[in-house]
């Protein structure tokens, strides 16, 4: 999404990870460090799961707060859908972000306490006053510039005009949280 916080600031506020086998297929295709086990620590660092933060596959101290509706909070239509799915043989799935789960149940949402916990709120707001961070409106990253394997800069387009360049002095991925692998592949070519 073209908003501060990217796609995490849009749509239905669903905070759902990909299937472990999808990440594992990336690693098997040669993307070292992208297996589910490799990424799990980052998933955990990213979240404060208000329902399952005590589980080994969830976090309890990350910047993005996640929750699920309790069954008693579901509206009539949701309860009917849940009952129909269970009657059709689908397993109860209280945590869709748990490894190897399928079934029907409430989705994890990033809207705890009535706030949409986007990457802008969870990551950028606490860092806005840092001298090494610049947030620019109407700016799109077109390419990540490398010196060997180290990202050193960004080629950007501002207000639809290409050609700007920004120097990277901090470590870490200069990509949004959503669509990152695909974006990294496109930007690093």
Which sequence ranges carry the predicted segments?
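Glycine-rich loop(s) and the adjacent beta-strand/alpha-helix scaffold that form part
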Residues: 42, 144, 154-189
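Short, isolated positions in well-ordered beta-strands
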Residues: 9, 92, 162-163
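Short, solvent-exposed loop/turn and secondary-structure capping segments
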Residues: 7, 13, 52-55, 146, ...
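Conserved redox-cofactor binding core of oxidoreductases
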Residues: 27-151, 157
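N-terminal glycine-rich phosphate/pyrophosphate-binding loop and immediately adjacent elements
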Residues: 1-44, 155, 189
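Surface-exposed beta-strand-to-loop junctions
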Residues: 5, 20-21, 59-62, 183
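Structural recognition of the beta-strand scaffold that forms the well-ordered cores
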Residues: 11, 15, 65-67, 94, ...
């Amino acid at each position: 999404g073209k908003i501060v916080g990217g796609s995490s600031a849009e749509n239905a506020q669903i905070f759902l990870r990909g299937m472990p086998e999808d990440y594992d297929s990336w690693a098997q295709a040669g993307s070292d460090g992208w297996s589910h086990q490799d990424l799990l620590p980052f998933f955990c660092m990213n979240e404060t799961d208000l329902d399952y933060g005590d589980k080994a596959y969830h976090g309890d101290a990350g910047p993005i707060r996640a929750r699920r509706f309790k069954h008693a909070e579901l509206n009539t239509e949701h309860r009917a859908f849940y009952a129909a799915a269970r009657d059709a043989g689908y397993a109860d799935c209280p945590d869709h972000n748990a490894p190897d789960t399928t079934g029907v149940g409430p989705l994890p949402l990033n809207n705890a306490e009535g706030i949409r916990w986007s990457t802008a709120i969870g990551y950028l707001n606490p860092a806005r006053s840092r001298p090494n961070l610049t947030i620019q409106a109407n700016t799109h990253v077109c390419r990540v510039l490398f010196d060997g394997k180290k990202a050193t800069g960004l080629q950007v387009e501002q207000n639809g005009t290409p050609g700007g360049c920004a120097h990277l002095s901090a470590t870490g991925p200069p990509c949004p949280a959503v669509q990152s692998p695909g974006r990294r592949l496109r930007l690093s070519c």
